[in-house]
């Protein structure tokens, strides 16, 4: 459960992304594909090479979904319901992959915003991404 401090940290951190969300989303996906090659199996129709239009496009979708989540911290299940249905019933993504992408997102954010990436912000963003992952996998049962 996100505390009031966590929510404030997430909103502040997300606000500092500016117009870089899609860029960071694509970078995190690229990191995931490179570091965890088995994740590529969910994207057989993608050119998963660095900087491809498909990776950039999906990175933008990831960033948009997380921006939506950051704006609805008190109702993540409601805000992400359609996305949860998609991943559970149509895409059938192995839940562990959300943890892998979350890790890559944290690395990407830390690399771009080292001064703002304090231990408290790191912990809050980690809890936020874990909460999003839990919501996205909640309909797998």
From Swiss-Prot:
Residue numbers of N6-acetyllysine PTMs: 16
Residues that bear N6-succinyllysine: 7, 11, 16, 40
Globin domain mapped to chain residues: 1-141
Top-level lineage group: Eukaryota
PROSITE patterns (alphabetical): GLOBIN (PS01033)
Pfam families named in the record: Globin (PF00042)
Residue positions, PTM Phosphoserine: 3, 35, 49, 102, 124, 131, 138
Post-translational modification Phosphotyrosine, affected residues: 24
Keywords: Acetylation, Heme, Iron, Metal-binding, Oxygen transport, Phosphoprotein, Transport
Tissue expression: Red blood cells.
Residues annotated as binding heme b: 87
Residues where Phosphothreonine is found: 108, 134, 137
Any one annotated GO CC term: haptoglobin-hemoglobin complex
BP GO annotations: hydrogen peroxide catabolic process
Residues binding O2, per UniProt: 58
Keyword Phosphoprotein among record annotations: yes
Stored Gene3D superfamilies: Globins (1.10.490.10)
Family annotation (InterPro entries): Globin, Globin-like_sf, Globin/Proto, Hemoglobin_a-typ, Hemoglobin_oxygen_transport, Hemoglobin_pi
Single Gene Ontology MF annotation: oxygen binding
Record function comment: Involved in oxygen transport from the lung to the various peripheral tissues.
Family: Belongs to the globin family.
Subunit structure: Heterotetramer of two alpha chains and two beta chains.
Stated name of the protein: Hemoglobin subunit alpha
Organism this protein belongs to: Peromyscus californicus
